[in-house]
């Protein structure tokens, strides 16, 4: 099936399914029901079945889903055998945490380099990742770097995004409050932690469990 027709909400849930199925496989489990998946990932069973239906017959009624088959399917669908190389721009507290973490649970995603303007950080390694001066951004970003993580001050986020647009980067994970304007060939995911926290507090107050 043409993955362009898969709803974005479904696409966002695929890595969640994949991680749980990975854990099932490691535990030696051979099959799983949509109800078990629902309980584990906190997505209702009907939504899971609908998500899976976009990819054809992944399971059998009365049997559930074969764990190894799902693992193989999602690995291919999510391109888990291809390495995604990432650059991080902004080595403050959040950026430093990313460098130490470096997606240890995702073997196909690696931060290769970082950029900052601090004299104390430029020329060092954090979590084994070299930190370069921001002035070297275009020079250092190779054609292999496809994704950038932005953890810079909001005041400079747009100017950095403009520079990234001149490189081979096609995806930006933006952790700044700034809403960025870039060309259509670059996809941006905005993650504003303050907004997420405010949303959580609102739901706690207005939708008590």
Curated annotation (Swiss-Prot):
The gene is rex. Residues 16-55 bind DNA. One of its GO terms (biological process) is negative regulation of DNA-templated transcription. GO terms for cellular component: cytoplasm. NAD(+) binds at residues 90-95. Belongs to the transcriptional regulatory Rex family. This is Redox-sensing transcriptional repressor Rex. The keyword DNA-binding applies. It is found in: Cytoplasm. Its main location: cytoplasm. InterPro entries: CoA-bd (IPR003781), NAD(P)-bd_dom_sf (IPR036291), Rex_DNA-bd_C_dom (IPR009718), Tscrpt_rep_Rex (IPR022876), WH-like_DNA-bd_sf (IPR036388), WH_DNA-bd_sf (IPR036390). SUPFAM superfamilies: NAD(P)-binding Rossmann-fold domains, Winged helix' DNA-binding domain. Modulates transcription in response to changes in cellular NADH/NAD(+) redox state. Homodimer.
């Amino acid at each position: 099936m043409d993955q362009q027709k898969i709803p974005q909400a479904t696409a966002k849930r695929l890595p969640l399914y994949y991680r749980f199925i990975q854990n099932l496989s490691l535990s030696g489990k051979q099959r799983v029901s949509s109800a078990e998946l629902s309980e584990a990932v906190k997505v209702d069973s009907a939504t899971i079945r609908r998500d899976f239906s976009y990819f054809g017959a992944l399971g059998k009624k009365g049997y559930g889903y074969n764990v190894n088959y799902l693992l193989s399917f999602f690995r291919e669908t999510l391109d888990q055998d291809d390495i995604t190389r990432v650059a991080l721009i902004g080595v403050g507290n959040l950026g430093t945490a990313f460098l130490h973490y470096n997606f240890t649970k995702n073997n196909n995603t690696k931060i290769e380099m970082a950029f900052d303007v601090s004299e104390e950080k430029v020329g060092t390694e954090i979590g084994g990742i070299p930190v370069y001066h921001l002035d070297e951004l275009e020079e250092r970003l190779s054609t292999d770097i496809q994704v950038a993580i932005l953890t810079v001050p909001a005041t400079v986020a747009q100017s950095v995004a403009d520079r990234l647009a001149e490189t081979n980067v096609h995806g930006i994970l933006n952790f700044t409050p700034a809403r960025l304007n870039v060309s259509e060939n670059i996809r941006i995911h905005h993650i504003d932690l303050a907004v997420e926290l405010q949303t959580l507090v609102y739901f706690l107050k207005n939708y008590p469990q």
